Curated annotation (Swiss-Prot):
Residues 1-41, 114-147 are annotated as: Disordered. InterPro entries: DUF4644 (IPR027978). It holds the Pfam family DUF4644. Residues 116-125 have a biased composition (Polar residues). It comes from Mus musculus. This is Uncharacterized protein C16orf90 homolog. Residues 27-38 have a biased composition (Low complexity). PANTHER family: RGD1561796 (PTHR37334:SF1).
Length: 171
């Protein structure tokens, strides 16, 4: 009560808070888009970008490295050209260096399976390979990619994390 009655008593004190609230808000609204808004926007973008770099590696390995890495690898690499399997293996080797040995071995083990499963289930190869096997084991086709996807996720995620951290460290 004392502070409340004392604040309005002073001419400068009640003058300052309204100024802060009204003037501050007004200034933010007016200058927001041009000067003041650009900085927080930049910061937010930066935060989101860094979070986007961080999250996929840790929280959604299937989402980011699955769709981006494996999608490119499978769709562009193994399906279109048969040389696809050595090409993606070369890439991690170049990026990783010493850590590639077990990763590439795992990739070699799972890549042929996955490329086979993908070619069988892909629409382009469906008329050739998929039609005869579709009527037989549809579950087998569904299981194979699932298995190899899981294995590839496990192999790729350390890769993604390592390459990401490497890229972050370089920058």
């Amino acid at each position: 009560m004392d502070a409340v009655s004392w604040a309005p008593g002073r001419p400068s004190h009640p003058d300052t808070p309204p100024n802060i609230y009204e003037g501050g808000l007004g200034a933010q609204q007016q200058q927001g888009p041009s000067a003041q808004g650009s900085k927080p926007k930049n910061f937010r973008l930066r935060h989101l970008r860094s979070l986007a770099l961080y999250l996929p590696g840790h929280m959604q390995p299937a989402g980011q490295c699955g769709s981006h890495w494996l999608g490119r690898l499978m769709a562009g690499g193994s399906l279109t050209r048969p040389e696809g399997s050595p090409w993606p293996l070369d890439l991690p080797q170049g990026t990783l260096g010493p850590g590639n040995s077990h990763c590439s071995a795992l990739l070699e083990a799972h890549l042929p399976r996955d490329s086979l499963g993908n070619t069988a289930s892909s629409s382009s190869m469906d008329p050739a390979k998929g039609v005869p096997s579709q009527s037989g084991p549809p579950e087998g086709l569904g299981l194979r990619p699932k298995r190899s996807w899981r294995a590839l996720e496990e192999t790729m995620c350390p890769l993604c994390k390592r390459t990401r951290s490497g890229a972050l460290e370089r920058t």
